[in-house]
């Protein structure tokens, strides 16, 4: 909200695109959950059809955390899994697949002409890589040791490869030593008005 003398108005958040890092939100903050919804809505409206894919993970709420977007599950090009992932095994497979895709981009597609998603798409306009948003709620619920490793790699390398992790973390549950490396790859969201 911006105010000056008698005038007051709300301005939208400024979000640079593509994202430079994963977006990490506290699990129990309703306003930041709405921010995740608004961010998804902006991505869906800003990118052309076929240029964005969503991976939605919501183990505790069984998909209710992304309720405004459930009708999109029918669009295979948009949500390749066709449903919100809730079980450990399917979460691990999806995160592993994204990690493999990131690895392939870094090793095979990026070179001296293109070192990231934006540059690659700029020089390959006929075959652009889609942007991928991975939305995870309730972390670390149903997140296996292997999934934590995959998620760490996605947070480190995903943003430059056009993969944005949006993660709602229950910080009390990730204080365990086994999450140290993963947590070190993250920067929490700070309400600066700019993401």
Identify what each model region corresponds to.
Residues 2-115, 124-195:
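P-loop NTPase catalytic phosphate-binding loop
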């Amino acid at each position: 909200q911006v105010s000056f003398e008698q005038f007051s108005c709300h301005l939208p958040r400024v979000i640079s695109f593509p994202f430079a890092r994963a977006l990490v939100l506290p699990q129990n903050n309703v306003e930041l959950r709405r921010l995740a919804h608004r961010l998804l809505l902006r991505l869906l409206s800003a990118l052309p059809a076929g240029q964005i894919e969503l991976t939605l993970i919501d183990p505790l709420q069984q998909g209710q955390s992304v309720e405004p977007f459930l009708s999109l599950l029918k669009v295979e090009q948009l949500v390749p899994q066709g449903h919100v992932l809730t079980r450990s095994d399917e979460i691990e497979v999806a995160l592993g697949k994204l990690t493999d895709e990131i690895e392939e981009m870094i090793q095979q597609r990026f070179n001296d002409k293109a070192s990231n998603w934006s540059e690659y798409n700029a020089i390959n306009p006929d075959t652009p890589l889609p942007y991928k948003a991975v939305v995870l709620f309730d972390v670390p619920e149903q997140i296996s040791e292997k999934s934590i490793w995959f998620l760490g790699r996605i947070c480190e390398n995903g943003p430059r490869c056009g993969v944005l992790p949006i993660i709602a973390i229950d910080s009390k549950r990730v204080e365990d030593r086994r999450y140290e490396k993963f947590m070190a790859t993250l920067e929490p969201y700070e309400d600066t008005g700019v993401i």
